[in-house]
C-alpha cells in the first residue's frame, strides 16, 4: 500500500472500531512516525486525522487512526478492501 502504510488490519475488533469510534487500523513501517502516518493517511484517503495511537507488536507496528467526524472510517475501510 505504499512506503509508510503496509496493509490494513481486518478483524472483528477493527470492524467495530471503524463502526463505533471512526478509527482505521493499519500495519505501518516500523520506522514511521505519527507525523509520517498522518501525512500518508490524509493524502492517500483525502481525510482529516484527529489522532493516532501506536502499538508495537511481534508482527510489526500497528497504527490506530481516528478520523474527523465528517469522514467515515467504514467507507474508507470498504474502499481499501478491509470488509
UniProtKB/Swiss-Prot annotation:
- A cellular component annotation (GO) from this entry: ribosome
* InterPro entries reported in the protein's UniProt record: Nucleotide-bd_a/b_plait_sf, Ribosomal_uL23, Ribosomal_uL23-like, Ribosomal_uL23/eL15/eS24_sf, Ribosomal_uL23_CS
* Residue stretches spanning the membrane: none
What the protein does? Binds to 23S rRNA. One of the proteins that surrounds the polypeptide exit tunnel on the outside of the ribosome.
The answer to whether keyword Ribosomal protein applies is: yes
What is the name listed in the Swiss-Prot or TrEMBL entry for this protein? Large ribosomal subunit protein uL23
What Pfam families does the entry give?
Ribosomal_L23
For this protein, the record's Gene3D superfamilies field holds: 3.30.70.330
Organism this protein belongs to: Thermoplasma volcanium (strain ATCC 51530 / DSM 4299 / JCM 9571 / NBRC 15438 / GSS1)
GO biological process per UniProt: translation
Question: Belongs to which family?
Answer: Belongs to the universal ribosomal protein uL23 family.
Q: Which NCBIfam families match?
A: PRK14548.1, uL23_arch
Endpoints of the signal sequence: none
Keywords of this entry? Ribonucleoprotein, Ribosomal protein, RNA-binding, rRNA-binding
Please give the Gene Ontology molecular function terms for this protein.
rRNA binding; structural constituent of ribosome
Describe the subunit structure. Part of the 50S ribosomal subunit. Contacts protein L29.
